Amino acid sequence: MKMLAQRTAALFLATLCTPLLSLAAAPQPTHEFMLDNGLKVIVREDHRAPVVVSQLWYKVGSSYETPGQTGLSHALEHMMFKGSRKLGPGEASRILRELGAEENAFTSDDYTAYYQVLARDRLAVALELEADRLASLQLPAEEFAREIEVIKEERRLRTDDKPSSKAFERFKAVAYPASGYHTPTIGWMADLERMTVEELRAWYQAWYAPNNATLVVVGDVGASEVKVLAERFFGDIPKRAVPPAKIPLELNAPGERRITLYLQTQLPSLMMGFNVPGLATAESPRQVHALRLIAALLDGGYSARLPTRLERGEELVASASAWYNAYPRGDSLFVLSATPNVQTGKTLAQAEAGLWRQLQDLQQNPPSAEELARVRAQVIAGLVYERDSITSQATAIGQLETVGLSWKLMDQELAELEAVTPADIQNAATTFFTRDRLSVAHVLPEEKDNE
């Protein structure tokens, strides 16, 4: 009966993977070209609806910032909505709003991006507005004085007054001892207090150049029409010299690091992070895709190992998770977190030991082919359905290009995941889950003596 069940499960997983992988074999038509001023343009056709997403990505984020000047990239993102030579503060957003467009922006360690989602026949408006602020952002001192207070309040609400965010910020600063990834994207409060509009203007002049940007357009468009519009609105913006930007590399084995934080939280928790490569820095892409699947083996839903073994089985933790970013500009972290089950009297030390047991199990015993196939099918299904969105497609393209990789990898990654074997899982676990790569944060409820 057990053999029959295993064969049935294997057949189900095979039938699930086949149509998903077939989608990877027939990607949407994608075109790329570069303007004379260095602006790279990537167009991906998706004609299912008369809608288009336009994203402009700049190769600058918090990992580019130096001590004492943290938060500049995020602050500049805010100020990009505060007026250009043609338009006053907020006027571009008003125009887009009246056209029924969605717009926003985001900043990370590695990039800053601005996007609009709108009807295909309004694409010219979005590109004209985006080119205008690239060419002639004004950065008025009075607008900066108001906006920096908004940013400081954002930091208070999202980080300083939010224990989980504050804990991760401190943990990240310890886990990345050698690279700019230890810098919080929003910046340290001391640097926000001292930031000047002159610093922001210098940051804009240094990094906001067409030859440091990638325009991604996905939707009901063709390459020729986008090229005409890109030339019209961006073609006359001159290229500029951009500062050199080195890849953020970490120490391979910086040594075990530990911090204990006392915060205004009701329950204790812990984080464990291992210094590992990303796709841009790995010796082999197979290592990276193995780490992605390990994260899913541990925390890929109800039947994953952490909830099955530690949460419901041993009742050791109330919750546990695993997370890995495969696509930074430099090195990455593989992060585990857990909250011990205080109702059964479990401690942080016991929860940490339980997480270690799961990693050691992967080091000593490769997963079965059936378990790996099930997890891989979940990961592939998630990627396929996520890419059904034109916004997700554009974001994947922009992220890859901006961290120094090729957009073509998004059309190859399903096959790369399919190639990972149980032995690859075991090898990655053995190579990367070592104590000299480890950072640990224990978060405890604030004690009265520490107030």
Where is each model-derived feature located?
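Short, polar/flexible loop-turn hinges at active-site or ligand-entry regions and domain interfaces
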Residues: K82-K86, L134-E142, Q364-P367
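M16 family metallopeptidases and their MPP-like homologs
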Residues: R44, A49-A75, P89-R133, S164-A190, ...
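N-terminal secretory signal peptides that target proteins for export/translocation
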Residues: M1-Q6
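Bacterial N-terminal signal peptides
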Residues: A9-L20
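Boundary at the C-terminal end of the N-terminal hydrophobic targeting segment
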Residues: S22-P27
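Active-site His/Glu-centered metal-binding helix of metallohydrolases
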Residues: L72-M80, I294
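An aromatic/glycine/proline-enriched structural segment found at the starts
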Residues: P177, T185, T214-A280, L444-E451
